[in-house]
């Protein structure tokens, strides 16, 4: 899962949106550095990552990547799941329009920004103003996201080419998303994530 899915599942679970978004920027035990609700959100994010990576649908989808891009398949798929969530938001969350959810999520996250790591602050400088969560529905933007990550981290250069795997398996990936994401939403609503 990437930013949008983590925020969405956190909302459904009544967990800290801030902690769920912050988690990828925190190493080790967060309990010394953040309030308990944010710590709980960080731990939820980590559980979701482990759960998602081990779902049969996700493991199967990783196998569809070519040998030269398979190493970055988990990252590419995380971004792709956000594409499908953004694209189908009105079906999955009909009572909370995506633009309203993004404003709500931003308000939640801004509360912890002053005490956050510099890389997280930098992310927030772009995430909200450039409307990433809404733009995820556009595959051209997904390609830009993958290229941007590859540019910032040369060892992830294969992300550029992973775009072709997404394009080749788009319909099958969308089917897999519909198989597992509603289950995860139900788990989040039951606070079972």
Swiss-Prot record:
InterPro entries (UniProt xref): ACP_PD, ACP_phosphodiesterase_gpbac
Gene Ontology biological process: fatty acid biosynthetic process
The organism's place on the tree of life at top rank: Bacteria
Record bears the keyword Hydrolase: yes
Pfam family name, one: ACP_PD
This protein's record includes keyword Ribosomal protein: no
EC number: 3.1.4.14
Reaction(s) catalysed by this chain's protein: holo-[ACP] + H2O = apo-[ACP] + (R)-4'-phosphopantetheine + H(+)
Keywords of this entry: Fatty acid biosynthesis, Fatty acid metabolism, Hydrolase, Lipid biosynthesis, Lipid metabolism
GO molecular function, one term: [acyl-carrier-protein] phosphodiesterase activity
Coiled-coil residue spans: none
Function description: Converts holo-ACP to apo-ACP by hydrolytic cleavage of the phosphopantetheine prosthetic group from ACP.
Family according to the record: Belongs to the AcpH family.
Protein's name according to its UniProt entry: Acyl carrier protein phosphodiesterase
Gene behind the chain: acpH
């Amino acid at each position: 899962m990437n930013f949008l899915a983590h925020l969405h599942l956190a909302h459904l679970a009544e967990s800290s949106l801030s902690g769920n978004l912050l988690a990828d920027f925190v190493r080790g035990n967060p309990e010394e550095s953040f309030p308990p609700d944010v710590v709980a959100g960080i731990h939820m994010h980590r559980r979701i990552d482990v759960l998602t990576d081990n779902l049969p649908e996700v493991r199967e989808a990783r196998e569809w990547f070519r040998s030269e891009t398979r190493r970055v398949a988990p990252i590419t798929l995380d971004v792709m799941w956000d594409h499908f969530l953004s694209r189908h938001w009105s079906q999955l969350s009909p009572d909370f329009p995506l633009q309203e959810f993004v404003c709500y999520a931003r308000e939640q996250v801004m509360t912890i920004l002053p005490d956050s790591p510099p890389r997280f602050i930098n992310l927030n400088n772009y995430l909200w103003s450039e409307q990433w969560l809404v733009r995820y529905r556009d595959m051209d933007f997904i390609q830009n996201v993958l290229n941007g990550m590859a540019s910032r981290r040369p060892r992830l250069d294969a992300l550029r080419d992973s775009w072709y795997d997404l394009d080749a398996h788009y319909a099958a990936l969308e089917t897999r998303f519909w198989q597992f994401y509603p289950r995860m939403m139900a788990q989040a609503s039951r606070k079972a994530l």
